[in-house]
Amino acid sequence: MIVVTGSVTARQDTFDQARKLSLEHVHRSRGEPGCISHAVHVDCENPLRLVFFEQWADRAALLNHFAVPASREFVKSLQSLAAAASSIELYDATRLEKL
């Protein structure tokens, strides 16, 4: 399984638009093949920061997600609303156990 974490901090005047775009992206992405989960959250310590958490079946599914035109457009649109550069990290993960 591939785990993706990411974040972006919006400007005060663009936060509502950034949140709306992010929710649209998350809902669309959940329907893609290989998407196990895809979520966006507001950071409790910085209410202008959106935090993404995604789980993908494998790297191929994630690369297909990145290739979707709507995903590429989302990244461009979100970056235009950001106060600073976004971050994204990929992890190769194995579930050890569900508690």
Kindly label every feature range from the protein language model.
Residues I2-T9, A39-F66:
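Short, well-ordered beta-strand segments in beta-rich or mixed alpha/beta enzyme
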Residues I2, V40-L48, F74-L99:
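Glycine-rich beta-strand-turn "strand-cap" elements at beta-sheet edges
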